[in-house]
A protein has these predicted regions:
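Outer-membrane beta-barrel domain signature
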Residues: 30, 45-50, 79-83, 130-135, ...
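Transmembrane beta-strand segments of Gram-negative outer membrane beta-barrel proteins
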Residues: 28-45, 186
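Short glycine/proline-enriched turn or capping motifs at secondary-structure junctions
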Residues: 8, 179-190
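C-terminal/domain-terminus segments
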Residues: 167-181
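Bacterial Sec-dependent N-terminal signal peptides
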Residues: 1-31, 35, 196-199
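Polar/charged side chains located within well-ordered beta-strands of beta-rich proteins
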Residues: 37-39, 59-61, 163, 184
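Conserved active-site loop/cleft motifs that coordinate metal ions or position small ligands
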Residues: 156-162
Length: 199
């Protein structure tokens, strides 16, 4: 009986400590607390005729303009299942947090270019094949909407729905030739955001 009471007290104490910890989460970002750093992972399903399944990881570093808006840049890695290639996107990024609260919906836009490598389905003249010729400008664009939640004053989590699009020279079945195509994947993005003063 005594052990059961002690176990209940331990659980209640742990829950109260957790509640106190989460209750200290700030209601907004502090522009003087350092830049916004984000590490995230996304898993997407192909959409559209030329879409493909994509897995990616990214790091973003953004400067706060105010508590709700920040701009900066990022770099990532992605693997494309159907097209059988990998890419390293480098891009401009911006976040806008709609509310000055601990929980806030946000919008994120990433625009830049990418380096394509490790391509295996090249010049086969079939769907999901990419051209042997060197690509020109390689556009990368990824809009997303989601929600942010602070866990501590300097750490939070982000969850969003994103559309990752890459411009590639893909085989067009209807024209029997390679054409510039935006290949899309619609997915879920999960990340951690943090601020380190002076960084």
């Amino acid at each position: 009986m005594t052990n059961r009471i002690m176990n209940k007290q331990t659980i209640i104490t742990a829950l109260l400590a957790l509640l106190a910890m989460t209750g200290q989460g700030q209601t907004s970002f502090d522009p003087n607390g350092g830049c916004l750093n984000v590490v995230d992972f996304s898993f997407g399903q192909g959409i559209g005729e030329y879409g493909n399944n994509c897995v990616s990881a990214n790091y973003l570093h953004e400067v706060f303009i105010n508590e709700q808006f920040c701009i900066g840049g990022g770099i990532g890695y992605s693997h494309h299942k159907e097209y059988k290639f990998s890419a390293i996107p480098v891009y401009f990024s911006t976040h806008y947090f709609f509310l000055d609260n601990r929980f806030s919906p946000f919008a994120n836009l990433r625009v830049g270019g990418f380096a394509l490598f490790n391509a295996k389905n090249v010049g086969t003249n079939e769907k999901y094949s990419i051209s042997k010729e060197k690509q020109g400008f390689s556009l990368y664009i990824s809009p997303s909407i989601g929600i942010k939640m602070h866990i501590t004053p300097n750490i939070g989590v982000l969850a969003s729905v994103c559309d990752e699009a890459y411009l590639v020279n893909a085989f067009d079945n209807s024209r029997n030739d390679y054409r510039s195509k935006l290949i899309h994947s619609l997915g879920v993005n999960i990340g951690v955001c943090f601020q380190i003063k002076g960084w």
